[in-house]
Amino acid sequence: MSQPVKQTDFPGLKLVNRGKVRDIYDLGDALLMVTSDRISAFDVIMNEPIPDKGKVLTQISKFWFSQMEDIIPNHIISTDVADYPAACQPYAEVLAGRSMLVKKAEPLAAECIVRGYVSGSGWKDYKATGSICGIKLPEGLKESDRLAEPIFTPSTKAELGTHDENISFDEMVKVCGKELAEQAREATIRIYCRAREIADQKGIIIADTKFEFGVYEGKLIIIDECLTPDSSRFWPKDQYQPGGPQPSFDKQFLRDYLETLDWGKTAPAPPLPEEIVTKTGEKYKEALFKLAGITV
């Protein structure tokens, strides 16, 4: 296990955004996206990094992007540090395995969420209203039940430290335009349906996931990350039992721990015991190995 990378600082490179997990540098005609070992829950960044998490996320995204190229192009130029501009080379050791050189796309002003199961905030919404994000669902569904068809539930892209808000498809059309909103919705559902089949063969249920899209040279492409344990709920298929929450290979383990604390889900984050940090890291690595046969 390498030293955790909580944040990066690369003199000579222009940092343009430090998000919950990723540090983005502007290289002129491309962006350098570095995935740190930071972890957030309830939109709050924890104090403790999860060792190698950034490498796991990068490798899982690479795996999925390559599976979806016939559905939609992605933003990767290269993940081989040797291909990066000369200014990046002094930082090759940190960048290896946790970075991507990516196209400069104009991001859509909405996040694209697809749900195949009743879980998380969707379950809370359904219990209260019989709907998820305004989409009416059959009566009598249990927590973690599979939906007859996946549903598309976009959200706003919140500023760091604030919460995303669910929006209707009509509201997405208002902020993104009809054509792009429809293209993003179609790509979201198609990617999810394909990924669900691939993961199913490897013993994993993908309950829901979130994608980001952008426009590059006039065309819609998928950006950011793809079907990672940060952006998705992964459940072990052999333990699936509707009627309650499921064990998972993702951030849900951390969320469940935090729910046991007397914490208001606002910064500052509570300290995480070493056991929770270690177990979270193990779950991420297990997801990567099960899906792609890769260890980091």
From Swiss-Prot:
Pathway connected to this protein: Purine metabolism; IMP biosynthesis via de novo pathway; 5-amino-1-(5-phospho-D-ribosyl)imidazole-4-carboxamide from 5-amino-1-(5-phospho-D-ribosyl)imidazole-4-carboxylate: step 1/2
BP term (GO), one: 'de novo' IMP biosynthetic process
Reaction(s) the record says it catalyses: 5-amino-1-(5-phospho-D-ribosyl)imidazole-4-carboxylate + L-aspartate + ATP = (2S)-2-[5-amino-1-(5-phospho-beta-D-ribosyl)imidazole-4-carboxamido]succinate + ADP + phosphate + 2 H(+)
Pfam families recorded: SAICAR_synt
Enzyme Commission number(s) from the entry: 6.3.2.6
Recorded superkingdom: Bacteria
GO cellular component terms listed in the entry, alphabetical order: cytoplasm
InterPro entries: SAICAR_synt/ADE2_N, SAICAR_synth, SAICAR_synthetase_CS
CDD domains associated with the record: SAICAR_synt_Sc (cd01414)
Keywords from the named record: ATP-binding, Ligase, Nucleotide-binding, Purine biosynthesis
PROSITE patterns cross-referenced by the UniProt entry: SAICAR_SYNTHETASE_2
Molecular-function GO terms, alphabetical: ATP binding; phosphoribosylaminoimidazolesuccinocarboxamide synthase activity
UniProt similarity note: Belongs to the SAICAR synthetase family.
Name listed for the protein in its UniProt record: Phosphoribosylaminoimidazole-succinocarboxamide synthase
